């Protein structure tokens, strides 16, 4: 399925004029969800010049002379989503391997993300050095699909996380603080967007990164003007990491409720939080048949063979018998409580999914599932969407151009058949994706139908 999507999208992207220049386009009679969290503005005319939004005004009969007019009556537009925790290249079919890490595979995954309305992905720690050239092409506009942001090679632990069995054999695994600092300096020369570390013992089964090593990485990163994001599970690890200067908690705290002192310290230090709720949902959901299993929107995102894998009796039984399955169910419940506490405390909450790190963490679909889970946690649909638009752009430090729909911002948005402010599932009603003032695809379902 996905190879067909990638091929069709690639043709469409290159068929479109990627540099619209002075072309003026008016989107008529459209509802605008601007990504800031405020209410949807009905019956608007959005004027675009080149790749930027020129104005958003109440609909009228007057349009600029020579403008291209696109009637979007009955539609809603919203900013493209930004995934602030994803992975590229390692996944192919039902396998995770560094052998899968090729330019063709990365390109196909970027196009898949874009078809699902994901305009950018921050890859946290599992990239090879080739990613920096692709990132440069992405920023120049010569690489179609979602924009690349990357931590390059992350920092893990020898014989521990991240797992070698998932193709994550390229990361640094320092044994001493001095080694960690030296490797950080090597990484800094490549100018990653952030630095990624793993601090977790996988339910007490593996060695965990030593505090002196992660403290050294954080200090050295800050010396080079780089922020650090950490894989985390336990409350006490989060507390120690924040005390050591961590900038981004890249997963939910899932063993205990985040207490007021840590919330206050996070807010004081401006620590961001990426909950990746869908990660835990997917860990146990397929022991039965989840409600989304037969959804074309879900199935179109799957790598070949994954649907057969997750619907097999063997796989279901494997999940049911896994002693960690019950722990994952409990972990998600704790995560849901914590994400609401983080949001209510005014801490920067940024949508991320860990999609692409396993075959069941589906690129494109996961980002919409994450929004659904954020609403389940107690956020309104508009608040949930803001974590994936305004907030995620702020985390990437690109909110001067991306993340919201406003005059002067990039004309990058999703066209929806239904208003997601009334039902978060409506983010899945994608009829088109626009980038730099031009339509680049018609959503995953239409693209798949054309490819077939």
Describe every region a protein language model picked out.
Residues 32-45, 57-59, 333, 362, ...:
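Acidic, glycine-enriched loop/beta-strand segments at the rims
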Residues 76-140, 158-165, 212, 236-248:
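Metal-associated gating/positioning segment near the N- to mid-region
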């Amino acid at each position: 399925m996905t190879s067909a999507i990638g091929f069709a999208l690639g043709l469409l992207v290159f068929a479109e004029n990627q540099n619209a220049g002075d072309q003026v386009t008016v989107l008529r009679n459209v509802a605008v969800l601007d990504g800031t969290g405020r209410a949807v503005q009905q019956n608007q005319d959005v004027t675009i010049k080149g790749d930027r939004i020129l104005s958003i005004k109440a609909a009228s009969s007057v349009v600029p002379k020579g403008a291209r007019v696109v009637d979007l009556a009955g539609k809603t537009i919203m900013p493209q989503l930004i995934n602030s925790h994803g992975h590229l290249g390692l996944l192919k079919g039902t396998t995770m391997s560094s052998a899968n890490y090729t330019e063709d595979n990365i390109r196909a995954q970027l196009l898949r993300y874009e078809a699902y309305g994901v305009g950018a992905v921050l890859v946290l720690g599992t990239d090879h050095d080739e990613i920096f050239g692709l990132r440069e092409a992405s920023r120049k506009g010569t690489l179609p699909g979602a924009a690349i942001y990357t931590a390059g090679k992350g920092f893990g632990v020898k014989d521990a996380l991240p797992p070698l069995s998932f193709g994550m054999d390229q990361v640094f695994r320092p044994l001493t603080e001095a080694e960690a600092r030296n490797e950080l300096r090597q990484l800094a020369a490549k100018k990653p967007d952030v630095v990624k570390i793993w601090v977790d013992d996988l339910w007490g089964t593996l060695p965990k990164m030593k505090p002196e090593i992660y403290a050294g990485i954080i200090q050295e990163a800050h010396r080079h003007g780089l922020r650090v994001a950490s894989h985390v599970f336990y409350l006490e690890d989060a507390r120690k990491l924040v005390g050591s200067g961590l900038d981004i908690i890249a997963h939910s705290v899932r063993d205990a409720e985040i207490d007021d002192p840590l919330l206050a310290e996070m807010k004081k230090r401006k620590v961001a939080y990426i909950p990746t709720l869908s990660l835990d949902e997917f860990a146990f959901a397929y022991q039965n048949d989840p409600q989304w299993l037969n959804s074309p929107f879900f199935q179109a995102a799957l790598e070949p063979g994954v649907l057969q894998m997750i619907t097999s009796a063997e796989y279901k039984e494997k999940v049911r018998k896994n002693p960690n399955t019950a722990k994952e169910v409990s972990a998600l419940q704790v995560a849901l409580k914590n994400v609401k506490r983080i949001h209510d405390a005014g801490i920067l909450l940024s949508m991320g999914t860990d999609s692409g790190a396993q075959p069941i963490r589906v690129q494109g679909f996961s980002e919409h599932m994450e929004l659904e889970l954020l609403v389940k946690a107690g956020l309104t649909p508009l608040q949930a969407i803001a974590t994936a638009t305004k907030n995620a752009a702020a985390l990437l430090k690109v909110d001067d151009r991306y993340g919201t729909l406003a005059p002067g911002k990039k004309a990058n948005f999703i066209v929806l058949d239904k208003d997601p402010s009334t039902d978060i599932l409506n983010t899945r009603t994608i009829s088109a994706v626009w980038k730099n003032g031009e339509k680049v695809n018609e959503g995953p379902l239409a693209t798949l139908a054309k490819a077939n």
